[in-house]
Amino acid sequence: DRIVAATQTGMRAIVIGANGRVGTRAADLCAAMGVAVTKWDQAETASGGPFPAVLQHEIFLNCILARPGCPVFVPASAKTDPRKLTVIGDIACDPTSDFSPIKVYDRVTEWDAPALRVAENPPLDVTAIDNLPSMLPVESSEDYAMQLLPSLATLTDLEAGVWGRARAD
């Protein structure tokens, strides 16, 4: 309900990982709904944080591939810190990892109960469904096909290119 209300109240979303497939689509969805979008990627997070700007958006969509050394975007203190943030969509969904960039929750959510309330005043809800990126099967299939097609086109020469490198000794 709050996301729908965002289109009428001038809420803002921040998408981190905005240059990737999932982040691009997340930003597109927000824009299509009339939600103002701040797009961040590696350049904007290279400083390592902290990132108080994340807490000044009402919606945060995490679309990164978290790895060791990943900065924290939402610290545990965000539950009680002054903030505008009320909705987190952790599309990357890696809450139990030591390098999760979102420290306000510790478990995935499910389709039958997609939101987890982690703070009350103001409310802060997290959606973290571990198979959510699979909702983009067409985009994933097209991207995979475009990556595979050049290799398939050289299948007639098994000694060259990727086929030659893949050959067992």
State where each predicted segment sits.
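Glycine-rich phosphate/diphosphate-binding loop of Rossmann-like nucleotide-binding domains
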Residues: 1-64
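Adenosine-phosphate binding glycine-rich loop
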Residues: 1, 93-169
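Extended interaction regions within the primary functional domain
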Residues: 5-11, 34, 74, 80, ...
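Rossmann-like adenosine-cofactor binding region
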Residues: 43-122
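Generic secondary-structure signature for well-ordered alpha-helical cores
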Residues: 27, 31-35, 66, 149-160
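Conserved beta-strand scaffold positions in the cores of enzyme catalytic domains, especially
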Residues: 37-39, 88, 126
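Short, acidic Gly/Pro/Ser/Thr-rich loop/turn segments
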Residues: 21-23, 68, 96, 134
